[in-house]
């Protein structure tokens, strides 16, 4: 009797991942798409802010785009480690004026922090895939930093937006992002990354073009 033995590498690993970690795979695919959208959104917002002569707002958008890019990279790695081939298609985004863009960004960050990320973590924790839990937890904490950075500008996105924005634009600004977790800060932390506890050396200064 002839028995054909196929090497394990020929079997679709994604089937194994889906059977062992179905919720983790599902959530990681969703959040990866979300990060690709967020990065595209902030890149577009930065271009619009420059067009409207708000270089500091553009700088913030560039820093946030860099952070979202790191989140996406981490989610992509989790999926690949599980044997999946995630789609990296960049979505198109709607862009308004800078005031509207700040409003939309603040709303999106708030929804992620208060609703989506807690729900996603609750879904994947029972499967206990530690890399996915760590990546999602770090992204959640970094998104809270995004909200805080945006809130300074969003508070003035009503009738006083123009006056407040012009005042803010006169203040020099730098942004630093942790290349491990996407933590985004206006200055380097003193000891370690407040999100992933990595060394300060993991932070890079974002080239905002200002």
Per-range role (PLM):
Residues 1-9:
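Bacterial N-terminal signal peptides
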Residues 16-210:
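Non-heme di-metal
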């Amino acid at each position: 009797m002839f028995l054909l033995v196929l090497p394990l590498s020929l079997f679709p690993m994604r089937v194994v991942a889906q059977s062992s970690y179905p919720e983790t795979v599902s959530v990681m695919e969703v959040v990866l798409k979300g990060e690709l959208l967020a990065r595209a959104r902030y890149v577009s917002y930065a271009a619009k802010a420059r067009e409207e002569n708000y270089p500091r707002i553009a700088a913030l958008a560039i820093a946030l785009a860099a952070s979202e890019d790191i989140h996406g990279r981490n989610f992509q790695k989790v999926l690949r480690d599980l044997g999946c081939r995630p789609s990296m298609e960049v979505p198109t985004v709607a862009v308004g004026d800078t005031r509207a863009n700040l409003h939309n960004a603040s709303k999106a960050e708030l929804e992620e922090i208060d609703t989506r990320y807690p729900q996603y973590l609750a879904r994947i924790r029972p499967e206990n895939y530690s890399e996915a839990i760590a990546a999602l937890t770090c992204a959640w904490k970094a998104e809270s930093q995004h909200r805080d950075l945006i809130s300074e500008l969003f508070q003035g996105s009503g009738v006083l937006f123009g006056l407040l924005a012009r005042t803010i634009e006169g203040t020099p600004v730098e942004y630093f992002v942790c290349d491990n977790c996407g933590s985004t800060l206006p200055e380097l932390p003193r000891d370690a990354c407040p999100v992933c506890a990595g060394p300060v050396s993991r932070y890079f200064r974002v080239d905002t073009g200002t």
